[in-house]
Amino acid sequence: ACLDALSSGYRHIDTAAYYENEALVGAAVRDCEIPREEIFVTSKMWYEDMVEGKQEAAFEKTLKGLGLEYVDMYLLHWPINDVKGSWKVLEKYYEQGLIKNIGVSNFRPKHLKQLEVTANIAPAVDQIEICPFLVQEETVNYCQEHDIVVEAWGPLGKGKQLSEPEIVAIAKKYNKTP
């Protein structure tokens, strides 16, 4: 599927250790005829690995599983366990050039504020669930005020919201399909 997506023009692939598909993603990136620097790969550290003694091994497993020289974006998947220690590990690999950008996923303002206290590098992105019926305005505003890019996961509500009257009306207004 990833190879087909890349062939169709996709240039960003989002994966995670938890999804158990990093090897397939890496193979698609290596096997396609697109220069590596034109493909953006995001992966994430699962919260169970965000404990002292596991963080480095988790990232190294991701990098090895992908079979890539670097990851374009690496995120802390959830604000659970040792966030500060895990962030320090991400900063270390960022400084070594093994991660090009570091960020977080599912962090609310209170989590971002806690991280801000000890972080040397601010998160580049906060990947959060946003869809028409889950706006997360407080988190979006906080991120905008702190130059953190908001990236949506589940922006279509996993497809379940496409038949909602409000969505259908907007689509009809602009002569589009929901």
Question: Which residue ranges define each predicted feature?
Answer:
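Residues at alpha-helix caps and immediate loop-helix transition turns in enzyme cores, especially N-
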Residues: A1, N21-L24, K54-Q55, S86, ...
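N-terminal binding-site loop/beta-alpha segment at the start of enzyme catalytic domains
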Residues: A1-I39, E69
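Short, acidic/polar
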Residues: A1-L6, M50-G67, G85, K110-Q114, ...
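Short acidic/polar active-site loop segments enriched in Thr and Asp
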Residues: R11, E69-D72, K100, A124
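Short, well-ordered amphipathic alpha-helices
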Residues: V25-R30, F59-L63, L90-E91, L112
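A short, structured active-site edge motif that brings together acidic residues
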Residues: R36-D49, Y70-P79, N106
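CE4/NodB-like, metal-dependent polysaccharide N-deacetylase domain
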Residues: Q55-L76, K92-Q96, I148
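Beta/alpha (TIM)-barrel catalytic core signal, keyed to glycine-rich beta->alpha loops juxtaposed to Asp/Glu
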Residues: W78-P178
